[in-house]
Curated annotation (Swiss-Prot), chain A:
WD repeats lie at residues 103-141, 142-184, 191-230, 249-287, 289-328, 334-374, 378-416. Its main location: nucleus. GO terms for molecular function: ribonucleoprotein complex binding. PROSITE patterns: WD_REPEATS_1, WD_REPEATS_2, WD_REPEATS_REGION. HAMAP family: WDR12. Residues 10-91 are annotated as: Ubiquitin-like (UBL) domain. This is Ribosome biogenesis protein WDR12 homolog. SMART domains: WD40 (SM00320). One of its GO terms (biological process) is maturation of LSU-rRNA from tricistronic rRNA transcript (SSU-rRNA, 5.8S rRNA, LSU-rRNA). It holds the Pfam family NLE. It comes from Drosophila grimshawi.
Swiss-Prot record, chain B:
Belongs to the WD repeat BOP1/ERB1 family. One of its GO terms (cellular component) is PeBoW complex. Residues 141-150 have a biased composition (Basic and acidic residues). Residues 1-161 are annotated as: Disordered. Keywords: Nucleus, Repeat, Ribosome biogenesis, rRNA processing, WD repeat. Residues 17-26, 122-135 have a biased composition (Polar residues). Its main location: nucleus. This is Ribosome biogenesis protein BOP1 homolog.
Length: 419, 786
């Protein structure tokens, strides 16, 4: 037993970037067999000298979360026990709380939150708008086939505009008057030959991009008045819109589209590739080959990394800046079935959420590949889409006809304040 | 006499020891002659002698040549002497005296020369004394270095020519007056022997009598000279015969390690020595050849051989190495089989439980004819005492059997081939290197309420269609597992097949006796509409169909209520349809009705709404049919065999022999050269159509009947589904190189289907693009493995 633990004592330096939790930078000798709990007690004891209340911390050892015993962690990383080890501690991200369950008539395949509204797309061909308090505002029929993706174009006090795509091969541009609670279909975007599976609105909200099963990536104008003259008059009246740009390059269905910046698009496809498109060049800037079909890909503006969900149980982290191609930065194991959807936090640099066919959502820290931070349970069926656009709420829709809302309890606002 | 001596000069000793000796002898002979002359009887017939001499000379005339060959120096001299002889012969008749004088002259001159070599006289003695020659020692004459070596040498015969009978015991001639014969075959008369008185008188009168001896060979008397006597005396006193000999002469080392400036002999080298010898060259070349051919060995080799022979010698301890039998018996004896130890039953007084009861006895008797089946080979018996045990009744028979065993027992141990089992397994690549292939179950499509018979994937890979025994056809979205549409039919759905042409949106559904062409209304709306238009109305056909086809098949548009479900065309068959399969272009489709006898396989043409019955005769119970992906070929599987027909030429191309009892399914490689066949007797057969009509490989991977088998369109993969609930995914690489055989590696066994009523997996089908496989099972589910 002694030999097993027998690494004896390890010298550690405790550091933090959160100033108000700082402890004096002196080396502490601690047992090698300690885990997070013991470290927490120890650190809290140190802090209590300063009269602070008890806080839960997570410990980062060499840029990776400490999950088991310290000695195991060090052994795995092949770090000598003789060295003084720097342990960075951060306040533990508080567990998101299930807040609401929004019941639908059919599978919910698309969710998007913005402000206090939640937009959902449903397999019964309707779009629904909910408040984040769980109040159903509106059901919008219009599509003739299941909705596959929705996205907000703009939202203000008076009007909300959003776009929805569906298996009926169209994308629809909607304008919603909040006060009168009336919704208008501004235009129908026709051009795709198969189901439109993904949509993304450009940062300036002037354009949006759709990816479809017909392998095409199409760009559309998001203006209320389509700036096409003359011949499009008739089309405008009928509300039919044609793509501004069509980008061909994928060999299979495009399952994920995201704007990286005003002129750069990220797409993920079933043909096992991630592509970064430059809209000025109208071509491919970077291509990352993977070995699985990609179901979802998400790019973080904070750390400029891409996390993908593909046809297996793992989430993978890619760096689009590397030239070597498919360098997987990290693999996140935890789900038990296909991961269908993934999204970075818009405020926390290291956090992202994922939804999987094993009926679970998981909240991950990208520095903790072995285990997620939290499992967000609640769904009784496959999770089809997840959204964390609103930092306060994690919203996911699933095949159990519900949308689950989890309140991300950590007041990101607080966090901002501390910064 | 003079002539005789002259002739004698020519004669040389054939066995002359050396030059010097011969020279001295010759010179001595001359002296002897004088001596002999003196004792000679005056009355002797000289002519006779002459003749003998001549004869003798002619006999040895060859030696003359020899002599001259030996020493070139003699040549001139000999000629001179011969000239002398000639001269002598001429004068023969004229004047004997002259000759004598001549002789004397030469003799004196010889004597002069002899003076220098006094030892020569001693040598003469040996000749003259004949028998006593054993004491004669040839003394090398001391040469005067100032004189040329062979200056004075001339040879003459030293043989006693008066003896013609040779060296024989002379007493043989005691009774005769003569000794031998001369040239003219006349007797040579012995010299007269005086009586004792004469001897006595001579002893008194002759002062030299004491030194007169008789030559035993010739019987003549010889007068010994003073030198002879001195020599005899010296020999008798065991001194060195030559008085001149100085025993203590200073030693001159003639042959030393020192190289002298001047040659030892001052005779110039002969011309011959400067010329390369031809014969020597021949000899050398012969030796070189012999060396090359290995007939001859160099001295080094010979030396080495000798050295080796001298080294330690090894020899066989036993006779040979190959005579293994002898050694084997020592090292590796075949041990006799061990007999069981005797048990209680074998005792003469066994405990009662070992004795047979009635049941055991009955069993014993039952195996009367097959005694080897009995548990015991004897019947336990009980005796009161050992005395009562009878003699062993089967003794003789047992001996006989033992002998028989010995006769048949193996004499040598059978050598087992010691091959490592690993070695026999073909080297297959590791499955890890053959990725991607499905490894885990990813999705389960639930919704059917009875066993799902068939599944087919949309060519683009977004949807699947499944047909079930619950009389429904369901269309599913692959990625989410959502059932998009359920189409109810009137009968059990045996087979569904999505049209492989991506430009058409049709599903062929075999339900009962009807084949439904359904528009699934998924995917591209434009295609859906186009397909609807295409199927809306029947093209006018002017071909009159034969009665045979009419009774078998009827085409009709669907009823309005079925139209709503998506059914567009109904092809009603006369028997239940079991299988439907499309041609790659999507215009033709073939159906199988196992009960249709000679009309069990049908080919329908969609665009013309026509049906054909390709076969007029039934070749067996048709199980399934298949279109070749590239060529106009048609595969028909009956229970046991597969026939390949050319649809254009309408003839049988090939018949594949499966050697199995019941074929369940077929799948053809997208390139069209390899065919996979699944059978109900647990086998999967891989046919290389270019190779032979027999299976290239037979795989027995499943534990139960194999229901279905399928090739992937893009990846080198195939999968099989079986009643043992397993889907086995294998790697099946077909190489473009015709010389390389297909590589088959079983990769993964996927066993998640539940067993229901002895059925497991009923159908397998690959996703057209992804390495994903769909399997349908008796547990009412469709499962996706990725």
């Amino acid at each position: 037993m002694e030999a097993e633990n027998g690494e004896g004592q390890v010298q550690v330096h405790l550091k933090t970037k959160q100033e108000h939790y700082a402890v004096p930078d002196v080396p502490y000798a601690i047992e090698g067999s300690v885990s997070t709990t013991e470290l927490n007690i120890f650190l809290n004891a140190l802090l209590q000298n300063k009269g602070a209340a008890s806080v839960d911390f997570d410990f980062l050892v060499f840029d990776e979360y400490l999950r088991g015993r310290l000695c195991d962690h060090l052994r795995e990383k092949a770090i000598s026990f003789e060295d003084a080890i720097e342990i960075e501690y951060v306040e533990r991200f508080p567990a998101p709380e299930p807040q609401d369950c929004l019941l639908h008539d059919d599978w919910v395949s698309a969710v998007k939150a913005s402000g206090k509204w939640i937009l959902t797309g449903c397999y019964d061909n309707t779009i629904n708008i909910w408040t984040n308090k769980g109040k159903h505002i509106l059901t919008i029929p219009g599509h003739t086939a299941p909705i596959k993706a929705v996205d907000w174009l703009s939202l203000d006090e008076v009007n909300g505009r959003f776009v929805s795509t569906s298996q009926d091969q169209t994308a629809m541009l909607w304008q919603w008057n909040i006060d009168s609670n009336a919704v208008d279909c501004v235009s129908v975007c026709k051009g795709h030959e198969r189901s439109v599976d993904s949509v993304a609105v450009s940062p300036d909200a002037q354009r949006f991009a759709t990816g479809s099963w017909d392998t095409m990536l199409k760009l559309w104008s998001a203006e209320l008045e389509d700036a096409v003259e003359g011949s499009a008059k008739r089309a405008k009246e009928s509300g039919v819109r044609t793509p501004k740009m069509t980008l061909q390059g994928h060999r299979e269905s495009i399952s994920a589209v995201q704007w990286m910046d005003g002129t750069t698009l990220l797409t993920g496809s079933w043909d096992h590739t991630l592509k970064v498109w430059d809209l000025n060049l109208e071509g491919i800037k970077t291509e990352i080959s993977t070995n699985k079909s990609i179901f979802d890909a998400n790019f973080s503006k904070l750390n400029r990394l891409i996390v993908t969900a593909s046809a297996d149980k793992n989430l993978r982290l890619y760096d689009p800046r590397t030239n070597q191609g498919s360098v997987v930065r990290n693999t996140y194991l935890g789900h038990n079935a296909w991961v269908q959807t993934v999204m970075w936090s818009t405020t926390e640099e290291f956090l992202f959420v994922s939804g999987s066919y094993d009926n679970q959502n998981k909240l991950w820290d990208c520095r903790s590949p072995k285990a997620p931070l939290y499992d967000l349970l609640g769904h009784g069926e496959k999770v089809l889409d997840i959204d964390w656009s609103n930092p306060k709420y994690i919203v996911s829709g699933g095949a159990d006809n519900t949308v689950r809302v989890f309140k991300s309890r950590k007041a990101t606002v607080d966090h901002m304040e501390t910064k | 006499m003079a002539k005789k001596s002259a002739i004698k000069r020519k004669v040389k000793a054939p066995e002359s020891i050396n030059e010097q000796a011969s020279v001295s002898e010759q010179s001595e002979n001359e002296e002897d002659e004088d001596l002999l002359q003196a004792v000679k009887d005056p009355g002797e017939d000289t002519t006779d002698d002459e003749g003998i001499d001549q004869e003798y000379q002619s006999d040895t005339s060859d030696d003359l040549l020899f002599e001259s060959d030996e020493e070139g120096n003699y040549l001139g001299r000999k000629e001179a002497s011969s000239g002398e002889d000639e001269q002598g012969e001429e004068d023969d008749n004229d004047d004997e005296e002259e000759e004598d004088e001549d002789e004397e002259e030469s003799g004196s001159s010889d004597d002069d020369a002899k003076d220098d070599q006094p030892s020569g006289s001693k040598a003469t003695l040996s000749k003259t004394t004949g028998d006593s020659s054993n004491i004669a020692v040839a003394i090398p004459p001391r040469r005067d270095p100032s004189k040329p070596e062979y200056e004075n040498s001339d040879t003459s015969d030293e043989e006693d020519i008066r003896n013609t009978v040779g060296n024989i015991p002379m007493h043989w001639y005691d009774e005769y007056k003569h000794i031998g014969y001369d040239w003219d075959a006349k007797k040579i008369i012995k010299p007269p022997k005086g009586d004792q008185i004469d001897d006595f008188l001579r002893k008194i009168e002759d002062p030299d009598f004491w030194r007169t001896v008789k030559d035993p060979q010739t019987g003549q008397e010889v007068l010994l000279t003073d030198e002879d006597i001195a020599l005899i005396k010296r020999v008798n006193s065991a001194r060195i015969p030559n008085p001149e000999h100085n025993e203590y002469e200073p030693w001159i080392e003639w042959f030393s390690s020192q190289v002298e400036k001047m040659p030892i002999k001052n005779v110039p080298d002969h011309k011959r020595s400067f010329l390369p010898s031809v014969s020597e060259k021949k000899k050398v070349s012969r030796m070189v050849h012999a060396l090359k051919m290995g007939w001859m060995k160099t001295t080094e080799e010979v030396e080495r051989d000798k050295q080796q022979k001298r080294g330690p010698k090894f020899y066989m301890l036993w006779e040979t190495d190959t005579g293994r039998e002898h050694i084997r018996r020592i090292h590796d004896p075949v041990s006799a089989p061990k007999r069981d130890l005797p048990g209680h039953a074998e005792s003469y007084n066994p405990p009662p439980e070992y004795l047979f009861d009635a049941k055991e006895m009955k069993e014993w008797l039952k195996y009367k004819d097959e005694p080897h089946k009995r548990k015991l080979h004897f019947m336990p018996q009980k005796f009161k005492s050992l005395r009562e045990v009878p003699a062993y009744s089967r003794f003789l028979r047992e001996r006989f059997l033992r002998c028989l065993d010995l006769y048949l027992c193996p004499r040598a141990k059978r050598v087992k081939l010691n091959i490592d089992a690993e070695y026999l397994i073909p080297k297959l690549p590791s499955p890890r290197d053959l990725q991607p292939f499905p490894t885990v179950e990813s999705l389960v499509y639930r919704g059917h309420t009875d066993l799902v018979r068939s599944v087919s994937v949309e060519p683009k890979g977004e949807y699947i269609v499944s047909g079930s025994d619950d009389k429904t056809v369901k269309i599913w979205e692959i990625a989410t597992g959502r059932c998009i549409r359920t189409i109810e039919t009137n009968d059990v759905v045996r087979c569904v097949a999505w049209c492989p042409n991506a430009k058409l949106s049709i599903i062929a559904v075999a339900t009962g006796t009807r084949l439904l062409l359904i528009n699934p209304k998924v995917g591209d709306k434009l295609l859906v509409k186009k397909t609807d238009d295409l199927l809306a109305e029947a093209p006018s056909s002017d071909v009159i169909e034969s009665e045979r086809i009419k009774t078998a098949v009827q085409w009709s548009n669907a009823e309005p209520e079925e139209q709503e479900k998506g059914v567009r065309v109904v092809i009603t068959h006369f028997k239940p349809i079991r299988q439907v399969t499309w041609h790659g272009r999507g215009d033709y489709l073939a159906t199988v009705m196992p009960e249709g006898a000679n009309r069990s396989a049908l080919i329908h043409q969609l665009s013309k709404r026509r049906s054909q019955i390709p076969f007029s005769k039934s070749k067996g119970l048709i199980q399934c049919v298949l279109f070749h992906p590239v060529k106009p070929c048609f595969f028909v599987a009956t229970q046991h065999n597969i026939r390949i027909y050319d649809l254009v030429k309408q003839e049988l191309i090939k018949k594949l022999l499966t050697n199995s009892k019941w074929i369940s399914g077929m799948s053809i490689h997208p390139k069209g050269d390899n065919l996979l066949v699944s059978t109900y007797d647990k086998k999967m057969l891989w046919f290389d159509l270019d190779l032979s009509t027999k299976p290239y490989q037979t795989m027995r991977l499943h534990r139960n009947a194999v229901r279905s088998i399928a090739f992937h369109l893009r990846y080198p993969l195939f999968a099989s589904g079986s009643d043992d609930q397993a889907v086995i995914v294998s790697h099946g690489m077909v190489y473009n190189d015709l010389l390389q055989n297909p590589l088959i590696v079983p990769l993964k066994k996927l066993q998640t289907h539940e067993k229901r009523d002895e059925f497991g997996v009923l159908d397998v089908n690959w996703h057209p693009v992804q390495p994903w496989i769909f399997s349908t099972g008796a547990d009412c589910t469709i499962r996706l493995y990725t």
